[in-house]
A protein has these predicted regions:
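Metal-dependent nuclease catalytic cores in nucleic-acid-processing enzymes
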Residues: 132-147
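Glycine- and acidic
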Residues: 124-132
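Hydrophobic/aromatic pocket-lining and membrane-interface residues
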Residues: 114-116, 126, 142-145
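Metal-dependent nuclease catalytic cores that hydrolyze phosphodiester bonds in DNA/RNA
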Residues: 1-120
Length: 147
């Protein structure tokens, strides 16, 4: 959840958080409005899972590059508008793979791990997760990016 062009933009993670706990959404909104600080809770287990997830994602990216795929990287530290335009330009140019594709649509924004061009020219979202089984939150996230 963040402000962009004077409005709140939500992400698939925000929707999943709301489905889990409405109060968490209120706290996230207060942080987005700069009404409170985000708690700096240290959680070594969560940090380990995040790091392992990043490694898994990096390994998949390296595999795509090793296969000779044309990979365009969208840097998620860019302005959202710039990142969304760069994603659209990469798709229009026919990039094989777009890494960290940025999508912004009205009240929503998100970054897909990978968007891969299919033989028919359409793009398919590919998300890298450490989980062995799909979870509803993952499916919701993929639906958002696929829409």
């Amino acid at each position: 959840m963040e402000f962009f062009n004077g409005a709140i933009l939500l992400s698939p993670s925000d929707l999943n958080a709301f489905l889990e706990c409405e109060h968490l959404t209120q706290l996230d909104l207060a942080v987005a409005r700069h009404e409170r600080e985000r708690p700096a809770a240290e959680n070594p287990q969560a940090e380990l899972v995040r790091r392992k997830g990043d490694e898994h994602e990096a390994a998949y990216l390296a595999e795509l590059i090793a296969k000779g795929r044309d990979v365009v990287t969208i840097h998620n530290d860019w302005d959202l508008g710039l990142a969304a335009r760069a994603t659209e330009e990469a798709m229009l140019a026919g990039a094989d793979v777009i890494y960290q594709a940025c999508f912004v649509d009205e009240d929503w924004r998100g970054f897909a791990d990978f968007v891969e061009r299919q033989p028919d020219g359409r793009y398919e979202v590919v998300d890298t997760k450490l989980a062995r089984h799909s979870k509803p939150a993952y499916v919701l996230q993929l639906c958002f990016y696929s829409e």
